[in-house]
Amino acid sequence: MITVVTIPRSVSWKGDAIAVLNQTKLPHSTEYKTLTTIEEVWKSIVMLEVRGAPAIGIVAAFGLALASKKYTTLHIEEFQKKFNRDCNYLGTSRPTAVNLFWAIDRMRESIQEITTIKEAQKILEEEALRIQQEDEAVCRSIGEHALTCFKDGDNILTICNAGSIATARYGTALAPFYIGKEKGVHLHAYACETRPVLQGGRLTTWELKQAGIDVTLITDNTAAHAIQTKEINAIIVGADRIVANGDTANKIGTMNLAILAKYFDIPFYVAAPLSTFDITKQTGAEIVIEERDETEVTKIFGKQVAPVGTTVYNPAFDVTPNELITGIITEQGIIRGDYKREIASLFEKTS
């Protein structure tokens, strides 16, 4: 029996505006925010109202389609100049998430041969919708492949939120939970709360509960103890950037889990679409790591919890070395072994 799973949508195109699920309001209220300018799109990404590498790429694509609509009276050369400026502007919002730049480049390339602004506007809207539709299919495929790594009743640990609200639908790391639910395969999620912004506590638990999937929330510090005492069978995480040798940038704390997985001899999987790969970079040392505002650490929900003036180091991501990764699950299948060779081979086949 197939179960229909209700999954919330993160981004919706309204023709003259973008509706985004405001993730800063979760889990207390489900509010969709309307974005009507590229400046609002940029701010929504920076403020984490929309987040998750694929979702950021989707909203950026819609943002460029939206911005193009205000340039109707320009000459085509001036249109291209302003459009390129908008592309560069959106690229400053989140430097680590490669899907952002992938989507921007794809939108830019889609109108290279246009001769009229009306044609460009039509193509940009169609391309943004295509990016969203493709991401949903990609995430479902990731979920299908990931589900082959697990069995009914498995306890699986994750961090941050690589779920439906971080993508077009299904998510990456959470996709096997949804596909499993549809197929009657019961997987139990253990979600790290994910300090300092609590994406695990606020978002992963919220969306899995919405879908009726079993989830247990733990503090980040509990991960080792949970693996030791709760029969955790595997760890699965998403990714914000995977480079040519398989080194993976993901939410800060991910590398901690990879090290624990190696110690306890359980599989550590990364789930991500091919659009998250950056094969122009050879190792994780080349990845630019975003550092965020100190108040994310010194305050919790606006309340000061550390002495004023405390020095803070607040990187948003860390880089997990490829040797700690059991497999990278993509829409094309699972990459294992010699990541540099296998990733190069995969991109040769798909190019």
Swiss-Prot record:
Highest taxon above the source species: Bacteria
InterPro entries xrefs: IF-2B-related, IF-M1Pi, IF_2B-like_C, Initiation_fac_2B_a/b/d, M1Pi_N, NagB/RpiA_transferase-like
E.C. code: 5.3.1.23
Gene3D superfamilies assigned: translation initiation factor eif-2b, domain 1, Translation initiation factor eif-2b, domain 2
Residues flagged as site, Transition state stabilizer: C160
One example GO MF annotation: S-methyl-5-thioribose-1-phosphate isomerase activity
Active site: residue positions: D240
Known function: Catalyzes the interconversion of methylthioribose-1-phosphate (MTR-1-P) into methylthioribulose-1-phosphate (MTRu-1-P).
Family assignment from sequence similarity: Belongs to the EIF-2B alpha/beta/delta subunits family. MtnA subfamily.
Name of the protein described by the UniProt record: Methylthioribose-1-phosphate isomerase
